[in-house]
C-alpha cells in the first residue's frame, strides 16, 4: 500500500533541487551577475551607457570602413594585393 513517503521520494526531491553540472571557479565568479536576472528596475537604467557604447562602436566601424575605402590615409597602411602577398 502506498500511503506514505519513502526515502526514495525524499532523495529524488532533493536531487531535483540541486543544480546540474559541475561547479567551476568561473561559474562561481559569474553567479552574482545571474542573480539579478529577471528583475526590472524602474527608470532608464543603463540605457544611456548602452547608447554610448553603440555610438563608439559605430565610430569604430566608420573608421574601419574609411581605412578599407582609402578615404582615411594612414602611414604604412596600404590596401593592395601586392603588399598583402609579400
From Swiss-Prot:
List the membrane topology term(s): Single-pass membrane protein
GO biological process, alphabetically ordered? photosynthesis; protein stabilization
GO CC term (a single one): chloroplast thylakoid membrane
Alphabetized, the UniProt keywords read: Chloroplast, Membrane, Phosphoprotein, Photosynthesis, Photosystem II, Plastid, Thylakoid, Transmembrane, Transmembrane helix
Residues with PTM Phosphothreonine: 3
Q: Which SUPFAM superfamilies does the UniProt entry name for this protein?
A: Photosystem II 10 kDa phosphoprotein PsbH
Q: Does the keyword tRNA processing belong to this entry?
A: no
Q: Which parts of the chain span the membrane according to its record?
A: 48-68
Gene3D superfamilies xref list: Photosystem II reaction center protein H
Modification after translation (UniProt): Phosphorylation is a light-dependent reaction catalyzed by a membrane-bound kinase; phosphorylation occurs on Thr residue(s) in the N-terminus of the protein.
Q: Where in the cell is it found?
A: Plastid, Chloroplast thylakoid membrane
Q: Name one GO molecular function term.
A: phosphate ion binding
Q: Which family does it belong to?
A: Belongs to the PsbH family.
**Quaternary structure, from the entry:** PSII is composed of 1 copy each of membrane proteins PsbA, PsbB, PsbC, PsbD, PsbE, PsbF, PsbH, PsbI, PsbJ, PsbK, PsbL, PsbM, PsbT, PsbX, PsbY, PsbZ, Psb30/Ycf12, at least 3 peripheral proteins of the oxygen-evolving complex and a large number of cofactors. It forms dimeric complexes.
PANTHER family per the record? PHOTOSYSTEM II REACTION CENTER PROTEIN H
This chain belongs to the protein called: Photosystem II reaction center protein H
Q: Which gene encodes it?
A: psbH
Amino acid at each position: 500500500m502506498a500511503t506514505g513517503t519513502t526515502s526514495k521520494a525524499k532523495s529524488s526531491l532533493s536531487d531535483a533541487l540541486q543544480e546540474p553540472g559541475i561547479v567551476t571557479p568561473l561559474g562561481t565568479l559569474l553567479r552574482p551577475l545571474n542573480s539579478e536576472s529577471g528583475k526590472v528596475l524602474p527608470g532608464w537604467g543603463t540605457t544611456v551607457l548602452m547608447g554610448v557604447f553603440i555610438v563608439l562602436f559605430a565610430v569604430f566601424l566608420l573608421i574601419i570602413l574609411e581605412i578599407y575605402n582609402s578615404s582615411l590615409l594612414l602611414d604604412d597602411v596600404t590596401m593592395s594585393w601586392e603588399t598583402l602577398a609579400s
